[in-house]
Amino acid sequence: MKPQNILNLIGNTPLVESVNLVKNKNVKLLLKLEGNNPGGSVKDRAAYNMIASALERGDIKKGDKLIEATSGNTGIALAMIAQLMNIEIELILPEDSTKERTQTMRAYGATVILTPAKEGIL
C-alpha cells in the first residue's frame, strides 16, 4: 500500500532481530532501523514531533518562521518536516559544517545562515 503522506512513514521503520550481537541465548535483541525514516535519520521522529506538537498546542501556526541553531542531522530533519508542513525555517550552522549538510537543508527549502566556526553556534 502506498502512503498518502510521507509524514506517515516517520517512525514506521523495520524491527530486526540480531542474532550475532548478543552471546547470551536468553536475550533477544531487536534493532529498530531508524535509518529507514524518510530523511534517513533517527532525528526525523524528533523533528516531526517537535513541529507537530508545537502546531497542536498553538505555539506556532502555518506562516510562522522557525529558527534553529543546529550542526547536523536534526537540522536536516527539521528542514524536511518544515517543508512537508509548509512552514518556513531558518537554520543557523557553523561555517565549517559539511557542504553536504548545508546543501541538503537548502534542498529541503531551508534558509541556511553560516556563523564563524571559531565562535560555535550562538
Q: Where do the PLM segments sit?
A:
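PLP-dependent amino-acid enzyme catalytic core
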Residues: 1-122
